[in-house]
Amino acid sequence: MSDLAIPTISCTESDGKYGRFVVEPLEKGFGTTMGNSLRRILLSYLDGVAITRVRIDGIQHEFCALPKAKEDTLDFLLNLKNIRVESLSGLEGILYLRASGSKVVTAADIEPSNDFEVVNPELYLLTLDSDDAVLNVELEVELGRGYRPPESAENTPIGTIPVDAIFTPIRKVNFTTEPMHVGRETSLERLVLEVWTDGTVEPATAVSRSADILVKQFASLVSHSKVVAEIEASEPVKYTIPEEKYNMPIEQLDLSVRAVNCLRHAGITTVGEVINRGTKELLTLRNFGLKSLTELEDRLKTIGLSLNPEDELFEEAENNKKKNKGIDED
């Protein structure tokens, strides 16, 4: 319907970790629909950064006692999980925490990195209670979304402690709807959306990314009808990928670490998902350039696949048409 109200969004309050947004005017019922959708995306599907593995000098597992510290290893790990990190490079990596002597250790004691920024340096981690105490810790940082339980200890080397990771940068989302009127139209409403983040992302940016995810999901439904119409109007071109190749993890393509990290950061984990994105969308991914694209195309060719199979098949079909036309004319 072309006469539906077209809303606008405004930020009425923001302090870096909290944002209040008003979307208006909306047709009656659209406030709940939009608010529910945004809330689910915000809480579950935004990319974030978290610590996934910890290595502490002299500690083999989480049940060991921490020498010359007030906290035990479990309490220390619980505190480490609350460290919020922003990835400046879009890549995964390692942070180092080193401290010595009698002191209170906070997240500010983590060594500075060109790739990461700790956004809550005031976070308390533990207390060393001896002048000759020494603490050396390696923190593995990964990109992901939502929540991920710790890896099985059987899959990690001795001395590496896996921890459950909370990747989502969103802490809380609330929304309410209020009735409103525009002129004589009284059946409209407004959506009031409140977003709390952990400081690694601005609330306005989080809302924008969530809306972008929704748009891309619904766009496939819109384009589906166009594709069907085009296929019905022309000679059908079919392309199928064997299931074992479609579900093949991207790691099996032997890509560079940089290319794999870029793809996983975008939520792409299988060969089928790579092909579904296509060349144009892949080039919009952060840190994924022409060099990575060329590398990916070469690896796909080795297993008999292509990034743009539909284009190749369409070109082949057109060439066949021309050949058949030439035969008929002869």
UniProtKB/Swiss-Prot annotation:
SUPFAM superfamilies (UniProt xref): C-terminal domain of RNA polymerase alpha subunit (SSF47789), Insert subdomain of RNA polymerase alpha subunit (SSF56553), RBP11-like subunits of RNA polymerase (SSF55257)
Superkingdom of the organism of origin: Bacteria
Listed GO MF terms: DNA binding; DNA-directed RNA polymerase activity; protein dimerization activity
EC number of the protein: 2.7.7.6
Listed Gene3D superfamilies: 5' to 3' exonuclease, C-terminal subdomain, DNA-directed RNA polymerase, insert domain, RNA polymerase, RBP11-like subunit
Listed SMART domains: RPOLD
Assembly notes: Homodimer. The RNAP catalytic core consists of 2 alpha, 1 beta, 1 beta' and 1 omega subunit. When a sigma factor is associated with the core the holoenzyme is formed, which can initiate transcription.
Protein name: DNA-directed RNA polymerase subunit alpha
Lineage, highest ranks first: Bacteria, Bacillati, Chloroflexota, Dehalococcoidia, Dehalococcoidales
